[in-house]
Regions:
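Acidic, mature catalytic/reactive cores of soluble proteins
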Residues: 1-189
Length: 189
């Protein structure tokens, strides 16, 4: 598992480049769906540019590895840098819907790959929230327990923690999650 996560960290510069090609900035990362060198190799547009929930599972895997092994050094040395880049992607990918007064994520393909180009896939929106929460939680933990690594991460990522954390918290608090209130269930999109 650690080798797979190291692979993702090693591919971070290409993931940032992939996101930059799509108009994202400031170190936002979009990891490829299919690759052998970090560049996107998948030819289906709907999967390549809409199945973006894949970013969140990378963050989830980083956190699960650290929690299950007790190896917080990994997050301090490698994982948090990836988590920040993915959170920056989401910060730029969401849109604020005035009618809903919520953040929305438009034009995605969910993990079942059944419906393409849908708005507000529940899994994608929910996992975005969880990604941002995990990044915030581990930023605070690393700042307290690994101050030297925290300073290094802030320097290499050019992190404006006050500004970026405020934005991420706002998204967490105001993300739209589709639901059928009458039946008390979340709907796919």
């Amino acid at each position: 598992a650690k080798n797979l996560l190291a692979y993702r960290h090693n591919q971070l510069p290409k993931a940032i480049e992939n996101a930059r090609k799509l108009g994202f900035k400031d170190g936002a990362a979009l990891f490829p769906q299919v690759t052998n060198n970090g560049e996107e190799c998948h030819s289906e547009w709907e999967i390549t540019f809409e199945e973006i929930h894949r970013n969140n599972i990378i963050v989830y895997a980083i956190v699960q590895h650290a929690v299950l092994t007790g190896n917080m050094d990994y997050i301090a040395q490698y994982g948090l840098e990836v988590m920040i880049a993915v959170s920056r992607f989401w910060s730029q990918r969401v849109s604020f819907s005035q009618p809903k007064q919520k953040y929305v994520i438009l034009g995605v393909t969910g993990p079942d790959e059944y419906e393409n180009n849908v708005d507000n896939n529940w899994y994608t929106n929910y996992s975005c929230i969880q990604c941002l929460k995990m990044t915030l939680r581990f930023l605070e933990m690393i700042a307290q327990q690994y101050p030297d690594e925290y300073a290094r991460i802030r320097r290499i990522t050019n992190l404006d923690q006050v500004k970026e954390s405020a934005r991420w918290r706002d998204i967490i608090e105001h993300m739209y999650l589709p639901e059928d209130k009458e039946r008390g269930i979340f709907i796919q999109n």
